[in-house]
Amino acid sequence: MRESTWVSLLLLLLLPTPQRGGPQDGRRSPEPEPERGPLQPFDLLYASGVAAYYSGDYERAVRDLEAALSSHRRLRDIRTRCARHCAARRPLAPPGAGPGAELPFFRAVLERARCSRSCQSQRLGGPASRHRVSEDVRSDFQRRVPYNYLQRAYIKLNQLEKAMEAAHTFFMANPEHMEMQQDLEDYKATARVEAPLLDREAKPHLESYNAGVKHYEADDFESAIKYFEQALREYFNEDMECRALCEGPQRFEEYEYLGYKGGLYEAIADHYMQVLVCQHECVRELATRPGRLSPIENFLPLHYDYLQFAYYRVGEYVKALECAKAYLMFHPDNEDVLDNVDFYESLLDDSTDPASIEAREDLTAFVKRHKLEAELIKLAAEGLGFSYAEPNYWISYGGRQDENRVPSGVNMDGAEVHGLSMGKKSPPKIGRDLREGGPLLYENITFVYNSEQLNGTQRVLLDNVLSQEQCRELHSVANGIMLVGDGYRGKTSPHTPNEKFEGATVLKALKFGYEGRVPLKSARLFYDISEKARKIVESYFMLNSTLYFSYTHMVCRTALSGQQDRRNDLSHPIHADNCLLDPEANECWKEPPAYTFRDYSALLYMNDDFDGGEFIFTEMDAKTVTASIKPKCGRMISFSSGGENPHGVKAVTRGQRCAVALWFTLDPLYRELERIQADEVIAILDQEQRGKHGLNINPKDEL
């Protein structure tokens, strides 16, 4: 593609998108909020709060965790306000013609960037870069993990009411968390509370929508209208916030591996396309309830579907017609609503021209922008060479199912059915022949169970992969090199606060061995046994292509004393390794943030001197256990990584459970970088070893 074409495409992509219509359009851009002092980074406050919790300083834990949550909310608000302020104050100029035609446009871009930096720095009390956090921290706040720590800290401080609020807030985003459910029941019984608990992170537009549905079903149409209209105002406000937050820094993971450095226009277009796709998918974000993977079907259109009939029932036929026409912007061929339009038009005064009644203004600009974005993404995908499948955001199978579906006197033929959730794709079936039963390659390894005996697909259980001596040696290495966390990002207790989670990578083990901090022989054993496991998996499942490491670490889970009473949570919740498990839909969606490139998984256990910690397979409902495996020294479980093998780990209630966890891929593009570096370290060590055993020749003898 010629450079001039790239310029045209880039300028087209960066043109300002249509703004939402409606009563708020005439408002001035939101002025930045007044000074309130430097904002402390929420990730540092969060880390401090968690550390205080584990040290038993519960007052400090509460203080820092509450401050972290407050900082997180304020940061989002500042970013949103600054984005809207600068978009209004520094509009992007359309490109002109002739030499340097793009310069005014890029000047406007630079001015907006300066405005954004100045606004955020002023409001934050320092550079915005201080508030960039890791994906792990961002994920914790999205999953409301801080509230799990908070409720426990409040209980320690005998503040039951606040503990209940925190527990309820966490549970709303983690409905599968059995221990929290039990805690909530116990709290309610103790406090004798019957009133609904407060969800501190409730989404206003979802709350208003739910209230509207309740009033609608109770035939209270005046109240239903009030809440649905409020829900729409809140929805569009949330949409603007979501879009503003998409404008932050982006990551180019696939390019990082290749050392890719694009030219000016390619780099800008690559970055902007990530922003645009993020903004385009805000409709899915806003339709998804906390803790769910599947969005509410047909969510935004349903507001207008409910409203068109509610307005009809209160005699406001013009508004009913506006809402019906708004619904048709999503589903222009919906026969029921087309009939409704004809019916509403027949009810208008003779002085009112039906053709003059148009679809709701608040939606017209929204849909126009959404369609324009879809066209731009498709155009850019063809030119930039990335894949993007436009989801059906407005799936129409999930319409209302009630006796008020169509007004009286209107044809009611044509049944509706519930169907697929919007924007979802079922994972493809495994694109290779499924075989098993190949040779185990090494002596002394004992075959225990195959897939059929484990009630599943592509599963195998083996014993004696490690000797007792090797288990003891690896356990010793683990205690010498492990960090609190997973070994890559140091994430403390990522799955449950009732256990300490520690991990280490192969590369770190070799580094410690090379520095003499652990025996080099023991560090080398970690490397060697992981390679042994890879060869066994590749051979047993009779794979026709090379199996590569995609992720390797040694991991120990330790039960925390004083926190094991009444435990019924899992050490590691039920999940799949290469797709997002959706128990409600009985599906596993092979899409980011899942590690979609993983093909096989293996766990090699080091010990059995602990209570609990059984590895379990389940059905896709994440509840029906199909197999349970008790870890012990030298035992290895391996399986394919997809939705056919949901699995988890039961709570470790006493002692420490250690294992080597391995994930493999058939795609060399996704080879584990640390493993490649570890291979290089091993090559250097082998070369040094060969040098030590070489002939000791006096250089003078060679003369």
Curated annotation (Swiss-Prot):
GO terms for biological process: collagen metabolic process; negative regulation of cell population proliferation; peptidyl-proline hydroxylation. The active site is at R657. Fe cation binds at H575, D577, H647. Detected in kidney. Detected on kidney tubular cells, pancreas acinar cells, Schwann cells of the peripheral nerve in the pinna, and in tunica adventitia, the smooth muscle layer of the aortic wall (at protein level). Detected in lung, skeletal muscle and kidney. Detected in kidney glomeruli and in prehypertrophic regions of long bone from neonates. In the eye, detected in the epithelial layer of the cornea and at lower levels in the sclera at the posterior end of the eye. It is found in: Endoplasmic reticulum; Sarcoplasmic reticulum; Golgi apparatus. It comes from the Eukaryota. Residues 25-36 have a biased composition (Basic and acidic residues). A motif (Prevents secretion from ER) lies at residues 700-703. Pfam families: 2OG-FeII_Oxy_3 (PF13640), TPR_leprecan (PF23557). Its main location: endoplasmic reticulum. Glycans are attached at N444, N544. PROSITE patterns: ER_TARGET, FE2OG_OXY. InterPro entries: Leprecan_dom, Oxoglu/Fe-dep_dioxygenase_dom, P3H, Pro_4_hyd_alph, Pro_4_hyd_alph_FE2OG_OXY, TPR-like_helical_dom_sf. Its cofactor is Fe cation; L-ascorbate. The keyword Repeat applies. GO terms for cellular component: basement membrane; cytosol; endoplasmic reticulum; Golgi apparatus; nucleoplasm; sarcoplasmic reticulum. TPR repeats lie at residues 42-75, 144-177, 205-238, 301-334. This is Prolyl 3-hydroxylase 2. It comes from Mus musculus.
